[in-house]
Every structure is written in structure tokens, then in C-alpha cells.
Amino acid sequence: MTKTIKVKKSALIDIIKYPILTDKTTQMIEENKYSFAVEVKAKKPKIKEAIEQLFDVKVQQINTLIVKPQKKRVGKYIGYKSKYKKAVIKLYDPYKINLFADN
């Protein structure tokens, strides 16, 4: 028995940062899988709730991974990009998320 607590939309928007659009992720969209950068401390149930309420879809499966920081060099100085959490979300068949704006 799971409890679902209604959360404000502003709190859910803070969990999902932005969609990740690369060649690989656009191919995954054909399989009904979408990739998002999410808050590093976010857990799978919170990510699922945020996606379902923001995009009005049903989530079938969520896989998460933390992308480690990458070295970034500017001149002679070496810095790091921030780490982030990546969530790969699979939706049930009739549902879709429109990531590309139609003109």
C-alpha cells in the first residue's frame, strides 16, 4: 500500500531540470523512453510523481544514474563541470511527451 501525497507543482518543477537531447536519446524516443536531468538528491518515486503530474502521462519504468563530473580546461586552468543525475523514463504505450515545439 503506497501513499501518494499531493505536492505543489512548483516543488515538482524543481525536481526536473531539463530534458537531455542527444543523438542517442532521440533514438530512444522512438522506443517511448525519455531522458531528463533531475535533482541529484531526487529519488525514483518523486521523479515518477513529478513526470506524471507535469506531463500528464503514466510511467512504466525509471532508471537513474549519476553522471560524474567532467574535466573542463580553460587555458592553463583545469576545472570541472558539475555532476548531475540522469533519469531515463519509459512510458506506457499510448502516452507521449512532446519535447519539440510545433510551429
UniProtKB/Swiss-Prot annotation:
<dbReference type="Pfam" id="PF00276">
    <property type="entry name" value="Ribosomal_L23"/>
</dbReference>
<dbReference type="InterPro" id="IPR012677">
    <property type="entry name" value="Nucleotide-bd_a/b_plait_sf"/>
</dbReference>
<dbReference type="InterPro" id="IPR013025">
    <property type="entry name" value="Ribosomal_uL23-like"/>
</dbReference>
<protein>
    <recommendedName>
        <fullName>Large ribosomal subunit protein uL23c</fullName>
    </recommendedName>
</protein>
<dbReference type="GO" id="GO:0005840">
    <property type="term" value="C:ribosome"/>
</dbReference>
<keyword id="KW-0694">RNA-binding</keyword>
<keyword id="KW-0689">Ribosomal protein</keyword>
<dbReference type="InterPro" id="IPR012678">
    <property type="entry name" value="Ribosomal_uL23/eL15/eS24_sf"/>
</dbReference>
<keyword id="KW-0687">Ribonucleoprotein</keyword>
<keyword id="KW-0699">rRNA-binding</keyword>
<comment type="subunit">
    <text>Part of the 50S ribosomal subunit.</text>
</comment>
<dbReference type="GO" id="GO:0006412">
    <property type="term" value="P:translation"/>
</dbReference>
<dbReference type="GO" id="GO:1990904">
    <property type="term" value="C:ribonucleoprotein complex"/>
</dbReference>
<keyword id="KW-0150">Chloroplast</keyword>
<comment type="function">
    <text>Binds to 23S rRNA.</text>
</comment>
<keyword id="KW-0934">Plastid</keyword>
<comment type="similarity">
    <text>Belongs to the universal ribosomal protein uL23 family.</text>
</comment>
<dbReference type="GO" id="GO:0003735">
    <property type="term" value="F:structural constituent of ribosome"/>
</dbReference>
<dbReference type="GO" id="GO:0009507">
    <property type="term" value="C:chloroplast"/>
</dbReference>
<dbReference type="GO" id="GO:0019843">
    <property type="term" value="F:rRNA binding"/>
</dbReference>
